[in-house]
Amino acid sequence: VGVGLSLAYFLYKSMRPAMASLSLSTDKELHDALVFGLKTCRYIDVVRFDGPLFFANSSYLEEQIASHRKNQPELRHILLVSNGINDIDASGQETLSLLIDRVRSAGIDLSLSGVNDTVMAVLEHTHLVAKIGRDHIFPNSYTALRSIHEKTHKNHEAENCPLKHVVFQTSETEKTMHGESGPDSDEGV
């Protein structure tokens, strides 16, 4: 019975891995916006997926991205922080390919950051790198944001962006803490 319950719990957790929208926090690092009470950028959704992308959870990624798109009507770019994706199978590849088609056909761009060597080898072997575009795959989220942010924001839109300045969510008002121009580090998230 214990082994069966453990297996069931493992399968459930594998089907719904941790996934979070990230935003800049007071330590100049990207953290889970919900947990840290941070506002997210309305134009760029920085999404971290923590787990292998395989048959048991690929539809979950697709559902979550669809939900993010629905809840962010001004969304222009999705950055999938991939440090936590340690493996990908054929279902995961197919989901990623379809996801790229869907978001780009809706006028939203998609990039990856922090892709590990194992996953990158699979993406290259299956020609997904060509579909994504090498210029849309970054070594870490900070390098990605430096490239994406300027292209995605127009003029005044960048002034109080939660990816450049710490912006807390509050029930009454938004409290903004202007730091420097965002993350200084090239460390991964």
Question: What annotation goes with each model-predicted range?
Answer:
Residues V1-L22:
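Flexible hinge motifs at transmembrane-helix junctions and intramembrane kinks/re-entrant loops
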Residues M15-V189:
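Cytosolic C-terminal regulatory domains/tails of membrane transporters and channels
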